């Protein structure tokens, strides 16, 4: 799907821009050096926004999630399993890792609100869904927004729960898309 290519490449560009600025400013790509460096408040907020959106396009977060449902519906089940079980989780890990290394002391309320809107929006779209692949895709979007919310919240005990939830979702979403494929092969619908 062209949506998949466009949105994930746009996300990659934003992450690359933030990473390049970090390496240029710090003078090193080592996490220990980056962790010790102090960014100004404007730099921290700008970098967090770039990383939030860049990885958010790949996760995907609200309102940039439409490519995921289109991709899941159009793609074969094997790719849906790979996309939901690995690619989306890799973006979550990237956001978590860079966010934990940078440890910005900024107000993340607007980012938490965006993720919360994604949870509610996906829940409402799941309500009357008749396409089972779209239903599973919206479930993935809902849960990824919930985990993104947890990572933006920043509390260490909640983040641990988010990591466990991410691993669990990786296995269960793969299983759900496998079951969708089984139903499709059995009933051709």
Q: Where do the language-model regions lie?
A:
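Hydrophobic transmembrane alpha-helices and their helix-loop junctions in integral membrane proteins
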Residues: 1-189
